[in-house]
């Protein structure tokens, strides 16, 4: 029997937007601001599942495959910091309804399948920096990245040789 894996559902960023965000982050945040999230690990988490058995992963994948949700456009136009969790994030002022619906469906399915789900409201974001123990200056509004979201992904998270790696396991297309 295989070992449980640490899993989550997420939305990827297109490579060109990921590169622009990395450049923007390097321009606006000094190295001491926090530990930058690796470019390949930038994503928007929809539902964190925790440690999941192969059997539960299969069941969650079947449920995810039944979702019929239209695609939507994400506009990343907001940033902030959560001091308690020591995170600097990039997000959106007005999350699209489709994003909220997709996250709610996945979180609800996860909870019904026995995966703990936080009772805190969903705050869609992309983590830019971790271990940001001091308050940082957030760049003024004016940045804006938009892209069409056409799929979501199930990821496995692993830690080896001092690095976190997110491996895509399966993708599902959103309807047109």
Swiss-Prot record:
> What is the catalytic activity of this protein?
a 3'-end 2',3'-cyclophospho-ribonucleotide-RNA + H2O = a 3'-end 2'-phospho-ribonucleotide-RNA + H(+)
Q: Which InterPro entries match?
A: Cyclic_Pdiesterase, RNA_CPDase
Keywords attached to this Swiss-Prot or TrEMBL record, sorted alphabetically, are: Hydrolase
Motif extent (HXTX 1)? 43-46
Q: Could you confirm whether the keyword Lipid biosynthesis appears in this record? A: no
The Swiss-Prot or TrEMBL record annotates one GO molecular function as:
2',3'-cyclic-nucleotide 3'-phosphodiesterase activity
- Short name of any one Pfam family annotated for the protein: 2_5_RNA_ligase2
**Matches recorded under Gene3D superfamilies:** Cyclic phosphodiesterase (3.90.1140.10)
Q: Where is this motif: HXTX 2?
A: 125-128
* EC number of this enzyme: 3.1.4.58
- Report the domain of life of the source organism: Bacteria
Q: What happens when the gene is disrupted?
A: Disruption abolishes ligase activity in cell lysates, but mutants grow normally under laboratory conditions.
Annotated function: Hydrolyzes RNA 2',3'-cyclic phosphodiester to an RNA 2'-phosphomonoester. In vitro, can also ligate 5' and 3' half-tRNA molecules with 2',3'-cyclic phosphate and 5'-hydroxyl termini, respectively, to the product containing the 2'-5' phosphodiester linkage. This reaction does not require ATP and is reversible.
| Oligomer and partners | Monomer.
PANTHER family for this protein? RNA 2',3'-CYCLIC PHOSPHODIESTERASE (PTHR35561:SF1)
Name the record gives this protein: RNA 2',3'-cyclic phosphodiesterase
Gene that encodes the chain = thpR
């Amino acid at each position: 029997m295989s070992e449980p894996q640490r899993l989550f559902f997420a939305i990827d960023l297109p490579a060109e937007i990921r590169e622009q965000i990395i450049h923007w982050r390097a321009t606006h945040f000094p190295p001491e601001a926090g530990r930058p999230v690796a470019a390949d690990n930038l994503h928007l988490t929809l539902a964190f599942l925790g440690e999941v058995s192969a059997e539960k992963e299969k069941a969650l994948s079947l449920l995810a495959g039944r979702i019929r949700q239209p695609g939507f456009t994400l506009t990343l136009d907001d940033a902030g910091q959560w001091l308690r969790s020591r995170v600097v994030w990039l997000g959106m002022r007005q999350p699209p309804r489709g994003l909220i619906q997709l996250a709610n469906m996945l979180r609800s399915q996860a909870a019904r399948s026995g995966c703990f789900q936080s009772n805190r409201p969903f705050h869609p974001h992309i983590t830019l920096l971790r271990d940001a123990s001091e308050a940082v200056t957030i760049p003024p509004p004016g940045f804006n990245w938009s892209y069409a979201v056409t799929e979501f992904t199930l990821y496995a998270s692993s830690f080896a040789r001092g690095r976190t790696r997110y491996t895509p396991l399966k993708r599902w297309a959103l309807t047109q």
